[in-house]
Amino acid sequence: NQLGDGQNSRETLKVDWESILPIKLTENSISCMMTKEELMRKAIELSKENVANGGGPFGAVIATKEGEIIATGVNRVTASCDPTAHAEVSAIRAAATELGTFNLSGYEIYTSCEPCPMCLGAIYWARLDKMYYANNKTDAKNIGFDDSFIYDELELKPADRKLPSEVLLHNEAIKAFEEWSAKEDKVEY
């Protein structure tokens, strides 16, 4: 299949697929751009798969605003014996590793359920631009995942909380804070 100039058509006809298709071409793969609903369905699908695999009913997806999935996560608390391995935290860890940064601004998270206080804190710390969720706190409470006591505890002074706490060696510990504060080449987060 030759063109008039004698060159092979594969070499001559080059198409800029990225400009005409809703996909992102990468070195090793083609990533489909998804709608917000498709991204949420992916998070829900992950939560269902996780239940089938013996895990909790939670899934999360981190994506670009254009709909490219960067990372996913499921609840791995029982599988990994890690009480912090919630779907959102797992997705944040995977995205940060994939992107090589702790700052996930410019990205959005889709989670099958409204985040618990820990995950909400992680979402803020990761600086994600927007959060979408399907099930809410009441839905989670109705199946045994009630976080209301944590929200209640956060409103109290440390001395009034159910978890006993005590300040120890503050004068020694503050030195690390002072050293970090004075450091000119620190990376703030």
Residues covered by each model-derived region:
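Zinc-dependent deaminase
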Residues: 16-51, 115, 122-189
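Extreme N-terminal basic, low-complexity initiation segments
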Residues: 2-13
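Helix-adjacent hinge/juxtasegments
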Residues: 84-85, 89-126
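Short, basic and Ser/Thr-rich N-terminal targeting/leader segments
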Residues: 54-58, 105
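A short acidic/small-residue loop/turn micro-motif
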Residues: 76-79
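Short beta-strand scaffold segments in enzyme catalytic cores
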Residues: 58-64
